[in-house]
Design a protein with these regions (language model features):
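Conserved, mostly hydrophobic/aromatic
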Residues: 18, 31, 55, 87, ...
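Hydrophobic faces of well-ordered beta-strands that scaffold small-molecule active sites
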Residues: 18-21, 36-41, 70-76, 162-166
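Active-site-proximal loop/turn and secondary-structure-junction residues that shape catalytic pockets
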Residues: 24, 44, 78-80, 170
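Internal, glycine-rich beta/alpha segment that forms the wall or movable "lid"
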Residues: 1-34, 49, 53, 62
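Short glycine/threonine-rich loop-to-helix capping motif typified by GTGT followed
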Residues: 80-85, 173-183
């Protein structure tokens, strides 16, 4: 059995963090027992809420008292533009290309209004349109203030959440995605830096 892995060069930060995507709740008990952190990405709001709560509750069963969202990453699609309508128009081809591949395999992590995941007994199976993705809050679309507002909602609901992952929509040219990241850094990230600075000052 494999016990040790040597990495060259040696990681700067140790112990090395392990992150694993959470596709269903079945892997969560194993993850919390072994200190593996979770990535909950491209999920509807209700699925995300269920996964985050399950992760916290499973950790509590073994004596790990985590704040809601702690040791987790929230991931969503991103397209910044001057309006939501412009963002949707520009990202739609890439969004649709993504679900042409994912949807036939059942990789649509949305729920109905009762919290039932699509495709489970009693729940309807919808069409994963971009409009539905926006309604499910799996996408950050529009001007910076819209994106900041949604991230503030996540911050309020999940006080332990410190990591956000931005999804590079399949098929989007690399230069276009780099422009999106630059715009995110320029227009969105400054809204969150003062709080980080205040926390650092309080801890010193």
């Amino acid at each position: 059995q494999l016990r040790d892995v040597t990495l060259v060069p040696r990681p700067v930060n140790r112990p090395v963090e392990m992150w694993q995507a959470i596709a269903s709740g079945k892997s969560i008990p194993f993850m919390v027992q072994h200190g593996i952190k979770g990535m909950v990405t491209m999920n509807g709001e209700q699925i995300t809420r269920m996964m985050f709560r399950q992760f916290r509750d499973e950790a509590a069963k073994i004596g790990r008292n985590l704040a809601l969202g702690e040791d987790l990453t929230w991931g969503g699609g991103l397209y910044l533009a001057d309006s939501i309508e412009e963002a949707m128009e520009r990202v739609r081809p890439y969004h649709d290309e993504r679900f042409k591949w994912f949807a036939p395999f059942g990789f649509v992590r949305y729920a109905d209004d009762q919290g039932r995941p699509w495709g489970t007994p009693g729940a309807p199976v919808g069409v994963p349109t971009l409009e539905e993705g926006l309604r499910q809050k799996a996408w950050l679309l529009g001007p910076a203030e819209e994106v900041i507002g949604r991230l503030r909602e996540l911050e309020a609901e999940y006080p332990g959440l410190e990591q956000v992952m931005l999804h590079w929509a399949e098929g989007m040219p690399a230069d276009e995605w780099k422009d999106q990241l630059r715009r995110f850094a320029r227009e969105v990230m400054p809204a969150f830096q003062p709080r980080a600075a205040e926390a650092a000052a309080a801890g010193s």
